[in-house]
Amino acid sequence: TLEQTLGLIDAIGPDGLGLLVDSYHLDTTSTDAAALLPLGDALIVHAHINDAGSETTAETALDGNRVLPGAGRLPLQHYVDVLKAIGYSGFLCCEVLTPTPLGPTPTDAANNIRESLRKLGV
């Protein structure tokens, strides 16, 4: 969980450590993205954005059942807004783990990902 990870960083010390935040795993641990607000940008070194299928819940979500950002049930606009509010300027990695191709070609898949992120203002 976010709380456990922050406790570990606090115990070890932040030198050389950073936090990778992930929209999917925030959901599976029932953590609102607003919990990131007090952290600021310095601690967050990388961010993943992905969505969960609409038929899943936080309790039933599996890694292989992700969909394009904005195509599922996660409050991704809120997640993006929080990252912007804390001044996060690093990479935002789209991590769509699914057995279903995101497009007929790799170029189409990349374009579909780009369009889904643009709709979220990324």
Predicted regions and their residues:
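Histidine-acidic metal/acid-base catalytic patches
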Residues: 2-21, 25-122
